[in-house]
Amino acid sequence: MPLWQIYHPPGVFEDAESKAALAADITKIYTSVGLPPFYVVVHFNPIAPTNVYVGGTPKSFNPTPFIRIVIKHIAIRLNNDTATYRKTTGMIDNALKPHVYDKGWDCEYHVEETERRLWKFNGLIPPEHKSKEHEVWVRENKPVPYEGAYWSVEKGQY
């Protein structure tokens, strides 16, 4: 799952329309590479400017809002090469452009890759990307039980 945690000052992403538009553009990044939409989770977290310090100084709303984004990738690991990383950050930048950059807001983000084996949906181990089970999850847009999706602690097996 991609998990986006967007930290922003009050007055930014306040209305449902602006949140929905950004979340839709973020979701397109991942559906374009074959992930089901339900994998994509976006949290909007308003943070008072008095609670954000940049360089040891409180970051006030004026003159420019500061947006901090933490992105966690779990479903797919990126190839460890500059071209892949640049393509990925380019896709992220394109999604952010109309919602953040074009408004002149300051924005910083980073992407973390989390261990896939520590990830579950409703107790199910997500199927491997592009497997037949994965295609069912994409088609149904929800977790669907399949053989091997459950780990039995008692038996030490699937």
Predicted regions and their residues:
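A domain-level signal for the structural core that forms small-molecule/cofactor-binding pockets
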Residues: M1-Y158
